[in-house]
Structure formats: C-alpha cells, structure tokens
C-alpha cells in the first residue's frame, strides 16, 4: 500500500520533473549554496575507514596468511582489539595531520568529503571493530574550519554492509536491510545529525551523506528510497545549512525520478560516483572511448533534476595498483603506472586530458570531489596531491592545456 507521503511526493515530483536548479528551494543565508557555487573538493580516503589499497602498509603484515584480511572488520578481528586499537591510533594521528589540511586548502579545494564508518558511533556484540574515529573527525572539522574548508560527513559503511566491498568495512555479502540494520543506521544518522548541526559546526559542516555506494542491484530500491527519506526527515529540520546527501546507488538517475525524495526537496543533494576501470571492458577502452563516456556522463548530470555532485572519481585509466581489483577481478590492464616519476609525457598528457574533461563535465552539475587527497601506496592516479605536484592535475582547477573534448 502506498503511504500518503509517497503519494504526495509522486505528484509533487510530477509537477517539477522537468525542472532543475531553478525550482530548488533556496536556503536562507546558506553557508554553501549548491545552486550558485561549485563544489571543488577532495575525499579524505583511507583515514577513518581503512581501504587496503590506500594504506597497504597496514595490510602487508598479513601477507603470509592463506586468507588475509582485506577490510577493517578482518583487520580488527585478526589483530584483536588491543593491537588493532594501537595500530589504528598510530594511523589516525599520522596519515592526515593539520599540515595536510593546510596543503589541501592551498590547492583551491573548498569541500572535503570525510568517510567514516557506523562503528565509530555504534558497535554491538559480535562486531570486532574498535573505535576512536569520532575524535579524529572532530579534529578534522577544527582543521577544516581553520583553513576555510567545508565538510561532508559521509557514512561510508553501515551495519551489515551496503555493497559487500571493503570500503563498507566488511567484504562479502550484502547484509544491510536485513534484521535491524536499517533501524540501527537511522539511529546513527540521528546521532550524527544532532551533534554536527550544532552551532559550533555551523560554518564547516555543509552535508551529511546517508550511506556511501549502496549497491542498487543488490538491494531493495524501494527500501533504500524510504531510508533516504527517513534520513532526510531527520537531518533537514535541524539545520538550514546542512544538506542531506543521498547516493544514486549506481542506478540510472532517471530511476530516482519517481522516488519518495523529490529532487525539489529543500537542502537535498544527489551524489554520483563515476569510475571507468572496475570491469575488464572498461579497462581496455581507448582514451577516446573513455573521453566519450565522460561526455555522456556530463549529459546525464546536466539533465538531472537533482542538484548533482560527482562525489567520487579519479584520473585512473587502468586497474593497476596493489590490492585494488575490479568487480570482476579485472587487473593490470594498461600501463603499470605505479611510479609517476617514470610516466612519459604522452601518458601524463592522456591522464591530464582525462582529468580536464571530467572537471568540465562534472561542473555541468554542482561540482566534484576527487578520490582521494593522498595514498600510502603506489597509486598516483588516485593521489590528487601527487598529480598536482607533477602538473597532471590542473592548478588552478580552471587551467586548461587542452581544448574541450566534448565541445
């Protein structure tokens, strides 16, 4: 049976379907106005949520094991609570510091997306996670405010796992939407929203993301849309300057057109992630194929009725870094580009053109957030700082060495 809310949202959206930014309700004196400012951001990946390919130095200690852990759940389970807590404390205090935030601000970045797992706020019996991440999130907000950066708080992993990937905290099957996992997640959203919409964070926190990369084809989309509406109804009444960020779940944006969350909703932003490397056929494409795909992505973003930010993307043209494989286990297609100092001018130019084209197309929407600010392994096309150092990522972001590929 349809609820009154879903019926009302359907008819409201039907009236506004052909609109884009012009009908989005303007915020009163917003800290960040997504309808007039472009998000030019970077993710703080691999810090408060472990990803083995970003910080391989934390996972190579398990290399002699027949079934080594690949995620934070396994990391904590194998090491035990005390040793895991000790190693993670050292990681949190060193992988990102205040000087990193100062450097990031100097690049011209205006928004940070900071991933954090549900276990930072809620751990139950049977879950091996250790905590301590919330302290460092608070520290990051202090640094961000000091250097004029705005922040999205991104709930990167939820109970049960929303996608079965290591970035959710636990690799394997998708267990979210089973038992009490959604209720637990909404309780965490309530805690995060109540805390980070308080006045001391008003000048820095501009978004709370309900869940990172829920895998649409492995979930009940109606339940996901209802969850996003419930989360929106938690966050939105608390602040006029903190947007609710929802992820597109890797389904066509048109599938959201008749969801329970209307694109005209006050303070609502759609997050899309666009990579071209996680399947073998994508890795083997020519540069022209990749660029043409970017043009098509730009068309989709520009036609979306949602305020749309490309919240993850990279300059990576090949699936080629330690611990990082595609969804279909595609790997090592294309040049082994792990040492940027060995790149030819031709390859640098190809990556630069790919990045420039994505910047142009993603700004047809509300902007972009690169994945990621830095890595601890041989992954230069994922490392914004390294790309900037070698002149592959534009500085300033509007600088262009190539004419527009998409016309």
UniProtKB/Swiss-Prot annotation:
Reactions it catalyzes: Successive hydrolysis of beta-D-glucose units from the non-reducing ends of (1->3)-beta-D-glucans, releasing alpha-glucose
Location within or outside the cell: Secreted
Residues at the catalytic site: 213 (proton donor), 312 (nucleophile)
Keyword Cell wall biogenesis/degradation (UniProt): yes
Major site of localization recorded for this protein: secreted
EC number: 3.2.1.58
InterPro entries: Glyco_hydro_5 (IPR001547), Glyco_hydro_5_CS (IPR018087), Glycoside_hydrolase_SF (IPR017853), Glycosyl_hydrolase_5 (IPR050386)
Keywords in alphabetical order: Cell wall biogenesis/degradation, Disulfide bond, Glycosidase, Hydrolase, Secreted, Signal, Zymogen
Protein name: Glucan 1,3-beta-glucosidase 1
Source organism of the structure: Schizosaccharomyces pombe (strain 972 / ATCC 24843)
Gene behind this protein: exg1
């Amino acid at each position: 049976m349809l609820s009154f809310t879903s019926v009302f949202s359907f008819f409201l959206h039907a009236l506004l379907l052909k609109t884009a930014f012009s009908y989005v309700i303007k915020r009163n004196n917003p800290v960040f106005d997504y309808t007039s400012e472009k998000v030019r951001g970077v993710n703080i990946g691999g810090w408060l949520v472990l990803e083995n390919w970003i910080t391989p130095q934390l996972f190579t200690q398990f290399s002699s094991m027949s079934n080594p852990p690949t995620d934070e759940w396994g990391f904590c389970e194998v090491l035990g609570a005390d040793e895991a807590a000790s190693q993670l404390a050292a990681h949190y205090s060193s992988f990102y510091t205040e000087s990193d935030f100062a450097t990031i601000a100097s690049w011209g970045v205006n928004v940070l997306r900071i991933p954090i797992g549900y276990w930072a706020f809620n751990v139950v019996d049977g879950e091996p996670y250790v905590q301590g991440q919330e302290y460092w999130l608070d520290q990051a907000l202090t640094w961000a405010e000091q250097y004029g950066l705005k922040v999205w708080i991104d709930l990167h992993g939820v109970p049960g796992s929303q996608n079965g990937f290591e970035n959710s905290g636990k690799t394997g099957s998708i267990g979210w939407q089973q038992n009490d996992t959604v209720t637990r997640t909404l309780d965490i959203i309530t805690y995060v929203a109540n805390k980070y919409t308080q006045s001391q964070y008003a000048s820095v926190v501009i978004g709370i993301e309900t869940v990172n990369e829920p895998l649409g084809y492995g979930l009940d989309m109606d339940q996901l849309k209802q969850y996003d509406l419930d989360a929106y109804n938690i966050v939105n009444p608390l602040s006029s300057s903190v947007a609710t960020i929802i992820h597109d779940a890797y389904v066509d944006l048109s599938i959201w057109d008749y969801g329970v969350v209307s694109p005209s909703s006050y303070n609502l932003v759609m997050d899309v992630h666009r990579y071209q490397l996680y399947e073998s056929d994508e890795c083997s494409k020519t540069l022209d194929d990749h660029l043409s795909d970017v043009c098509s992505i730009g068309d989709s973003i520009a036609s979306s009725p949602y305020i749309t930010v490309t919240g993850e993307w990279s300059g990576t043209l090949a699936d080629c870094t330690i611990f990082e494989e595609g969804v279909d286990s595609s790997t090592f297609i294309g040049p082994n580009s792990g040492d940027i100092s060995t790149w030819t001018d031709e390859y640098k130019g190809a990556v630069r053109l790919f990045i420039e084209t994505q910047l142009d197309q993603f700004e047809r929407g509300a902007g972009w957030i690169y994945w990621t600010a830095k890595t601890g392994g041989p992954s230069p096309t994922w490392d914004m700082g390294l790309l900037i150092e070698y002149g592959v990522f534009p500085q300033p972001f509007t600088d262009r060495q190539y004419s527009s590929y998409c016309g």
